[in-house]
Amino acid sequence: HYIAGFPERARGRFYNSAMLVGPSGVKAVYRKLHLFEREQEWFSPGDIPLAVHRVGPARVGMLICFDWRFPETARALALLGADVIAHPSNLVYPNAQEAMRVRALENRLCTVTANRTGTETRPGGSVPFTGRSQIIGPRGDVLVRARKAGDCAMAADIDLKVCRDKAL
């Protein structure tokens, strides 16, 4: 299984979306709820309810990029039973990765942020991305984190029993 972001066109609108793909094809789509700055010029806010999907023994929810800024979104996925939140991103704020550590800790689940690196040149300026893709454990611990620049592949063992133990 994998999760990837993509621009989606549906019913005459465009969405910033992510898809969960399994052996038999697309299993689920999530449309970003919280649009960032000028995204509203191109995309509509998501109109699909938050959901959790089975991936083997794990229950996985999805957020996209700026959704990190809204704790209730991660909490809603936790209340739906998520063990893991997958978070494909183009993060530009340097504190976003730390906020995802907090989301993991608040909700006792794992977060997996796949973030863009490098700089995009646009009319009127450039946008530097923060890199530092990461996998965070349910106690807010960094299981693995990439550097700010360059491509990489990462993996970490996740104990689902710990993700499901909500006792403090």
Predicted feature residues:
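Short helix-loop capping/hinge motifs at secondary-structure junctions, enriched
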Residues: 25-28, 141-143, 163-165
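CN hydrolase (nitrilase-like) catalytic-core segments centered on the catalytic cysteine
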Residues: 1-3, 68-155
